[in-house]
Each structure stands twice: as structure tokens, then as C-alpha cells.
């Protein structure tokens, strides 16, 4: 985000430090002091860090080897002329904060800003958008390959439980370990899909004419994808496509309402809207049909190095949508004990409109 690039700050979060210098590890502290930056880590990672860090805005992070990351950061801060240091309080434990605050005293003000580093990442550049697009394309391919697999083995196996299917879909997502998951996949059959983030059951088994809700994503060069489809299971013609035909009329009605809500939101979102206004496009459709109480979560969330980033597309979000923001549009209806539908795609604000990624 504009205005944050030259602010002095620190982070121990891996995705935040990767954004700053193109490298991270599980024991490091990234520190920016005015126009200098430092990647502080222990001896296990210093060589790799020196080989991997990349300049950002013309500044290359200096790799500092340390057995005490916080003390090394304190030493550097004290020597600098910095008067204020920003950090995300959600990423720093109380012990670290107290230690910094005690050592810096009145010389340097520690300024906690929730989601500070996510604010810096809220607008994606073209390179990031292309990585997200590739990640989502691989995700879509995994949906297609998994559907083919389920059709193929349905008659061969006596039973396919939710738990088995949820475990198996990971192989299609990761390409047997080539890619990491962006989150634990959600696979829910029939009434279990009425729980938005259902846990897979070993007691529920796939049968013809069941519904399947599948929400999943991978990481491509660390950038996340996220997609949800709800499908009718026909062993002869099973595809995670937008057009679905359910035998039960009530289920078909609910599915069509969610589909209409998502389409209205995607076609209606514009740069300059607030997240609240974007949310209302989808929520309004569902409410007008009388299902508002069953749409129990926000319409969307930003995505990038983290699966959940800014902006939030929710009924409380005052964030102004701008060019380059990437987020999900995922309305849903969840009828407890009966049925659940969610349809999710990623969009980017481009030329003042939302465009499918």
C-alpha cells in the first residue's frame, strides 16, 4: 500500500518477510530501518539467505547472523535514528513485545497496527496477479482430474467415505507433493455441507445423486488459490461445473439462488465500492429470496501469500476496492441438517471492474 514502503517496521512472519526480500525461513526477523533493511537469522540459514534475498524498491536486505534475533534487532534499532517502529500485534508475542519495549524505552515508539503487513500487500502487481492466476488454473485442473477419478473408481470400490475422498483429493491438488496446500481441503456430502467448514466423516459414504461440496486450493510459488464448487453426483456424468442439475427441486432452487448471487456480485463489483457494498450485491439476492439467515459468512476475502488477506468483502468492511486487489466471491446458503451450497471464484479489480482470475 502506498505510504507504507519506507516506514520502519519489523516482522517475524514468514510470508511478510518473503514479500519484503523474496526469502524466509522458520527462524528469522526482518527489520527495515528507514532506507536500510536487515534479514536476521541463525547460522543454519545465513548462507542460503545471502544467496536468496532480492532487492525491494532498490534496497537489498543485509543478512545478519545471530543466535538471538531480538537482541540483534535491538542493537540495530538503537544505532539508527528511527523514532517509530511499526509491527503487526497479531504476529508478535507478548514476551517479544515487552523485551523490545523495555530495551528501546522512550527512544523508539513501538506502533502496533493490526494487519500492517497485509495492508502492504493489499494491491497486487502484475507479476503477483499472474502467479495467482497460474495457481488457480492448477487448482481448476485438480478439480477436473479428481472428478474423473471419482467416476472411475465409484463402481470399483464398495464404499467411498468423505474422509477417504478428502484425503485422496490432496494427491490431485499437490500432484503427489509437487505443490503445497493453501489450506486443508473441505469435502462435504449432502447434509454435512450445511456446515460451511465441515470436517470429513468416516461414516458418510458417497452414493449416486448425492451432492458434493468441495473447497480447495494450492500454492504456486507461494501464492494461494481458492475455489469452491457444489455438484450433483451422477456416476456417469460428474463434473464440478457451474451448471448443475439436482433431482430434488428445493436443492436446485437453493443452488440457483447462490449461483445468481455470485453472478450478480461478480458482474456488479466496481473499483471505488466499499467491501460492504460489494458484499450487499450477493447478500441482497439471497435475502430477497428469503434465505438471508442461511448465508452465515462474508462474501469474500483477499488472497495472496496468505489464504486470507485484505480486502474483506463483508457487511462490515469499509475498505475501498482498488485496481489490483484480488479476492474471492463465495456466497453460500446452509440449511442445517439438509443441504449446503457454496460457489467460489477469485476475481481481480481491473479496468475498474471485477474480472475472473
Swiss-Prot record:
It is an enzyme of class 3 (hydrolase). Optimum pH is 4.0-5.0. Its cofactor is Co(2+). Keywords: Aminopeptidase, Cobalt, Hydrolase, Metal-binding, Metalloprotease, Protease. Binds 2 cobalt ions per subunit. Optimum temperature is about 40 degrees Celsius. Its EC number is 3.4.11.-. Gene3D superfamilies: Creatinase/methionine aminopeptidase superfamily, Creatinase/prolidase N-terminal domain. InterPro entries: Creatin/AminoP/Spt16_N, Creatinase/aminopeptidase-like, Creatinase_N, Pept_M24, Peptidase_M24B, Peptidase_M24B_aminopep-P_CS. This is Aminopeptidase HP_1037. It comes from Helicobacter pylori (strain ATCC 700392 / 26695) (Campylobacter pylori). The lineage of its organism: Bacteria, Pseudomonadati, Campylobacterota, Epsilonproteobacteria, Campylobacterales.
